[in-house]
Amino acid sequence: MNRIFGIVSLFLLLSFSSNLSSEDLKLSQKTLKFTVIHPFKTVHGVCGEVNITPTTFSSGANGVQLPKAVKIEAPLKEFRSGDENRDSHILESLGFPENQSVSFSSTSIDITDGGWLVSGNLTINGVTKPVKTKANISSNNGQIEVSGKFQIKMGDYQITPPSLLFAKAKEEVEIEFSFILKP
């Protein structure tokens, strides 16, 4: 009887632990958006190509496992705002072609309620500054979304706010990110 109980217990333990095993999740969709507010128009932009390291994450019973570090790079040539003339001005104000990208390298990632608290260095226009943001983690239909947003000030990165008809855009830029992970 003890032997049967032991075999059943071992079977249940192995069955339960196989459900807890990690599964590789690959980045399937990467979105990086920015918003600049001008007195005459709110400009929404997007970066069409975002490079992220690592490209594979692990999941387990508690959701996505905390990565040791994350590096994100957004090539400036991929920034689009819906107006080619404005896009060329954005490139110029971000120091293109001398600066080829906007980049972020994490310095710490900690678990917080519903996600991660991510700290790191953001480099824009050749200027690197520390930033901190919350990355929200949500799960839906077998995929996991990592998303969040934060604000920067143009002056902190030696960027002059654009002006139109003698009115300048607000100093603040909202940066929004969303990354979809799938098995």
Model-based region annotation:
Residues 20-183:
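Low-complexity, acidic/polar, glycine-enriched regions of mature
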Residues 15-18:
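N-terminal signal peptide c-region/cleavage motif recognized by signal peptidases
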Residues 2-9:
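Sec-dependent signal peptide recognition
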